[in-house]
UniProtKB/Swiss-Prot annotation:
Its EC number is 7.1.1.2. Keywords: Electron transport, Membrane, Mitochondrion, NAD, Respiratory chain, Translocase, Transmembrane, Transmembrane helix, Transport, Ubiquinone. This is NADH-ubiquinone oxidoreductase chain 4. GO terms for cellular component: mitochondrial membrane. The keyword Oxidoreductase does not apply. GO terms for biological process: ATP synthesis coupled electron transport; electron transport coupled proton transport. It comes from Metridium senile (Brown sea anemone). The keyword Transmembrane helix applies.
Length: 491
C-alpha cells in the first residue's frame, strides 16, 4: 500500500521535537541529555522503518510534501513549490541516516566530556539536514541543505575533534567543500536563468541546449566530486577523518560521502543527460585512477583511521565508475555500493575507535596479538575486514560484482584496471587484521578489556545488516532498479 502522503512530514516533526526536547533538558543533567537524544533518534528510526515497510516499491515518488517558498512580494521572481518526496533510491539513504544517528549517540556516550548538549544538538540538526537533502525535489532547496550540512560538521570536527590538529582539519573540510559548492550554485543560477524554475519534476520535461548543459554540469561536477571525494579533490578527507570524533567519522564516511553520488544520480543524469554522457569517459578515467591510487595509498598507511579513509577513496571510485557507465547494472551497483560502504566504513571507524579508547594510539605498529585479550572484538573485526575485501555473502561483494560487471560491459580495459582494486583491497585488509590480531602481545597494550554491552549494541546492527544485504540483496536492488527505470535519466 502507499502510506499517507504526510508521513515524511511526521518524520521531520519527530526530528524537530527531538531537538526541542534536548534543548529543554538542563545542561548539567548529562544522563538525561543523552537518553533524550537517543530516544528521539530511535523514534525517528522507527518512523523511517515504518515508511519503508509501507512503501510501494514500484518506483514512483511517494509521501510528497509540498509547501510554497517564502519570497518577498516585491521581488520580480517566484520560485516553484518546495517539494519533499521519497522514491526507491532516497528511501534507503533516509534509513541509513536514521540508523547511524542513534549509533553515533551510543558510541559517543562516554567520550564527549564538554559541551555535551551542543554536541547532541549538532548531531540532531545534522540529521534534519541530511533527511532534507535526500528528500528534496527542488534544486535550490537541495543546495541550501547541502550547504547547511557544512556548519554542524565543521563544529563536530573543530570543537569535539580528538587531536591537536582538529581546527586545521575543520577548516580544510569547510574550505574544500564550500568552494566546491559555489560552483553548484553558479550552475543553479545558470539553470534558472535558462528555464525559469528549479523544480525537479518540471526540469525533467525540459530539454536544454547541449552547450548550456555542459556549463551547468561543470558546476555540479566540481561540487559533487569534492563531496564524494573524487581524485584529485580528496585531499581534505584523510585529515578530516583523523581529527574528527568517532561520530563525525561515522557521519562523514557513512552518509556525507554519499551526497556526491546521490547528486549525480538524482540530478545530473535526468536533467543534464547529454552533458553527462559527453563527460562520462573523463569521469570514468578519474574513477579508475581513484580506485588504483586509493588502493595503493591505503597500503602505505600507518594510521588506522587514515587507512580506512583512503580505502573510502577507492570504494567511492567504484561508485562513480558504476554511475557513469549509465547501465542498469552500473547505476544499481553505485547505489548498493554507497549503502554497503556506509555500513562497512562506519563499522570500521567504530571498531578503530574502540581500540583507540583503550590504548590511545591509532598507529598500527603498536598493535599486535589482541586475539586472546579481546576475542569478541577480534571476531567483529574479522567480519568487517573480510567484508571490506568483498568476500561472498557480504554486501560489498554484491556491490563490487555489479560495479565490475558494468565496467567490463563498458570497456574490458577499464574492467581489468578496476578489478585490480579488489586485489589491493584484499592485501591491505588482510594486513590490517593480521597485524592487529595475531602475534605475541605488544608491550604497549596494557589495557585489554573486551567490548562491553553498549559497544556491542552500537556496532551489532551494522554487522547484521552487512550479512542481510549480502544474502538478500534484492531488498535494495529491486526498488532501486524500479526507481531508476521510472526516472527519465534511467538507463
Amino acid at each position: 500500500m502507499i502510506f499517507h502522503k504526510n508521513w515524511l512530514g511526521l518524520i521531520f516533526l519527530l526530528l524537530f521535537l527531538g531537538i526541542i526536547n534536548v534543548m529543554r533538558v538542563p545542561r548539567d543533567n548529562s544522563v538525561k541529555l543523552k537518553r533524550t537524544a537517543l530516544e528521539w533518534s530511535l523514534a525517528t528510526l522507527t518512523a523511517t522503518l515504518i515508511l519503508w515497510a509501507a512503501f510501494d516499491m514500484e518506483g514512483q515518488f511517494q509521501t510528497i510534501n509540498q509547501t510554497e517558498w517564502i519570497v518577498p512580494p516585491a521581488l520580480n521572481f517566484k520560485w516553484g513549490p518546495l517539494f519533499l518526496a521519497v522514491d526507491g533510491i532516497s528511501l534507503f539513504f533516509l534509513i541509513l541516516t536514521a540508523l547511524l544517528t542513534p549509533i553515533c549517540i551510543l558510541i559517543s556516550w562516554n567520550s564527549i566530556k564538554f559541551l555535551l548538549k551542543e554536541f547532541l544538538l549538532c548531531l540532531l540538526f545534522l540529521e534534519v539536514l541530511l533527511m532534507g537533502v535526500f528528500s528534496a525535489l527542488d534544486l535550490l532547496l537541495f543546495y541550501i541543505l547541502f550547504e547547511g550540512i557544512l556548519i554542524p560538521m565543521f563544529l563536530l570536527i573543530g570543537v569535539w575533534g580528538s587531536r591537536e590538529e582538529k581546527v586545521r582539519a575543520s577548516y580544510y573540510f569547510f574550505f574544500y567543500t564550500f568552494v566546491g559548492s559555489v560552483f553548484m550554485l553558479l550552475g543553479i543560477f545558470q539553470l534558472y536563468s535558462s528555464v525559469g524554475t528549479t523544480d525537479y519534476q518540471a526540469l525533467l520535461n525540459i530539454e536544454l541546449p547541449i552547450s548550456t548543459q555542459k556549463w551547468i554540469f561543470a558546476g555540479f561536477f566540481l561540487s559533487l566530486a569534492v563531496k564524494i571525494p573524487q581524485v584529485p579533490f580528496h585531499i581534505w578527507l584523510p585529515q578530516a577523518h583523523v581529527e574528527a570524533p568517532v561520530s563525525g567519522s561515522v557521519i562523514l564516511a557513512g552518509i556525507l560521502l554519499k551526497l556526491g553520488g546521490y547528486g549525480f544520480l538524482r540530478f545530473t543524469w535526468p536533467i543534464l543527460p547529454a552533458a553527462t554522457e559527453y563527460f562520462a569517459p573523463f569521469v570514468i578515467m578519474l574513477s579508475v585512477i581513484a580506485i588504483i591510487y586509493g588502493s595503493l595509498t591505503t597500503c602505505r598507511q600507518v594510521d588506522l583511521k587514515r587507512l580506512i579513509a583512503y580505502s573510502s577513496v577507492a570504494h567511492m571510485g567504484l561508485v562513480t565508475l558504476g554511475l557513469f557507465t549509465h547501465t542498469i547494472e552500473g547505476l544499481v551497483a553505485a547505489v548498493f555500493m554507497m549503502l554497503a560502504h556506509g555500513l562497512v566504513s562506519s563499522a570500521l571507524f567504530i571498531a578503530v575507535t574502540y581500540l583507540y579508547e583503550r590504548h590511545h594510539t591509532r598507529l598500527i605498529k603498536y598493535y599486535r596479538g589482541i586475539t586472546f585479550s579481546m576475542p569478541i572484538f577480534v571476531s567483529v573485526f574479522l567480519v568487517l575486514t573480510l567484508t571490506n575485501m568483498a568476500i561472498p555473502l557480504s554486501c560489498n561483494f554484491v556491490a563490487e560484482f555489479f560495479s565490475l560487471l558494468a565496467a567490463f560491459e563498458y570497456n574490458i580495459v577499464i574492467g581489468v584496471l578496476a578489478a585490480t582494486g579488489m586485489v589491493w583491497s584484499a592485501a591491505y585488509s588482510l594486513y590490517l587484521y593480521n597485524r592487529v590480531s595475531f602475534g605475541a602481545s605488544s608491550n604497549y597494550l596494557l589495557f585489554t578489556r573486551d567490548l562491553n554491552r553498549r559497544e556491542l549494541i552500537a556496532i551489532s546492527p551494522l554487522v547484521i545488516l552487512i550479512f542481510i544485504l549480502g544474502v538478500l540483496p534484492s531488498l535494495i536492488i529491486d526498488p532501486v532498479k524500479n526507481a531508476i527505470m521510472f526516472s527519465p535519466g534511467g538507463a
